[in-house]
Curated annotation (Swiss-Prot):
<dbReference type="InterPro" id="IPR003495">
    <property type="entry name" value="CobW/HypB/UreG_nucleotide-bd"/>
</dbReference>
<dbReference type="GO" id="GO:0005525">
    <property type="term" value="F:GTP binding"/>
</dbReference>
<keyword id="KW-0143">Chaperone</keyword>
<keyword id="KW-0547">Nucleotide-binding</keyword>
<dbReference type="InterPro" id="IPR004400">
    <property type="entry name" value="UreG"/>
</dbReference>
<comment type="similarity">
    <text>Belongs to the SIMIBI class G3E GTPase family. UreG subfamily.</text>
</comment>
<keyword id="KW-0996">Nickel insertion</keyword>
<comment type="subunit">
    <text>Homodimer. UreD, UreF and UreG form a complex that acts as a GTP-hydrolysis-dependent molecular chaperone, activating the urease apoprotein by helping to assemble the nickel containing metallocenter of UreC. The UreE protein probably delivers the nickel.</text>
</comment>
<keyword id="KW-0342">GTP-binding</keyword>
<dbReference type="GO" id="GO:0003924">
    <property type="term" value="F:GTPase activity"/>
</dbReference>
<dbReference type="GO" id="GO:0005737">
    <property type="term" value="C:cytoplasm"/>
</dbReference>
<feature type="binding site">
    <location>
        <begin position="11"/>
        <end position="18"/>
    </location>
    <ligand>
        <name>GTP</name>
    </ligand>
</feature>
<dbReference type="Pfam" id="PF02492">
    <property type="entry name" value="cobW"/>
</dbReference>
<protein>
    <recommendedName>
        <fullName>Urease accessory protein UreG</fullName>
    </recommendedName>
</protein>
<keyword id="KW-0963">Cytoplasm</keyword>
<comment type="function">
    <text>Facilitates the functional incorporation of the urease nickel metallocenter. This process requires GTP hydrolysis, probably effectuated by UreG.</text>
</comment>
<dbReference type="GO" id="GO:0043419">
    <property type="term" value="P:urea catabolic process"/>
</dbReference>
Length: 211
């Protein structure tokens, strides 16, 4: 029986996908066996960033160069990523969590169910308060929606209460959370969600989760 959980992390360029994974791994790597697979079209920039900045050793981080549409590599033809998962499991048979970061994408990104057991979609306040109500599969179907960079709301004229209202309407009961990853605000809520809904720990919902 498979003992590890694959967590897909998607979202637009610059929303904070890599930052989220970097902060998460810093907090949980001492508690769980973790590995990361990143996707970039022509480079391994995200993998290199994580290698330099996360607490994970380099052999636990693998970069996949998709060479084309990032949608395809996580959905229609996930073979490169599935091979990367197999290689990571061969390296670390005890692995418990594998984060798979998609290439920067739009609001329609979704993971193949063969590739991700649960999905996190990251958007950010700097894109404007209208982003949640634009919908798209990433916002409406992901298991957890992360709305990052709350500290920028005053500078871009975004009303967080409007974003909360719209996200609640679009998500139809599915959880979402506001974060400021620069200061680790509500990072504990994301960790709590992973423990409860990915690792199936018998714990309460984090207080920072919104439904």
């Amino acid at each position: 029986m498979r003992k590890y959980i694959k967590i897909g992390v998607a979202g637009p360029v610059g929303a904070g996908k890599t930052a989220l994974i970097e902060r998460l791994t810093r907090e949980i790597a001492s508690k769980y066996s973790v590995a990361v697979i990143t996707n970039d079209i022509y480079t391994q920039e995200d993998a290199e960033f994580l290698t330099k900045n996360s607490l994970l050793p380099p052999e636990r981080i693998m970069g996949v160069e998709t060479g084309g549409c990032p949608h395809t590599a996580i959905r229609e033809d996930a073979s490169m990523n599935l091979e990367a998962v197999d290689e990571m499991v061969a390296r670390f048979p005890e692995v418990e969590l594998i984060f798979i970061e998609s290439g920067g994408d739009n609001l329609s990104a979704t993971f193949s169910p063969d590739l991700a057991d649960v999905t996190i979609f990251v958007i950010d306040v700097a894109q404007g308060e209208k982003i949640p109500r634009k919908g798209g599969p990433g916002i409406t179907r992901s298991d957890l929606l992360v709305i990052n960079k709350t500290d920028l709301a005053p500078f871009v004229g975004a009303d967080l209460s409007v974003m909360k209202r719209d996200a609640r309407r679009m998500r139809n009961g599915q959880p979402f959370i506001f974060t400021n990853l620069m200061k680790n605000e509500n990072l504990d809520g994301v960790i709590g969600w992973i423990e409860k809904y990915a690792l199936l720990k018998n714990i309460e919902d984090p207080a920072s989760l919104v439904r």
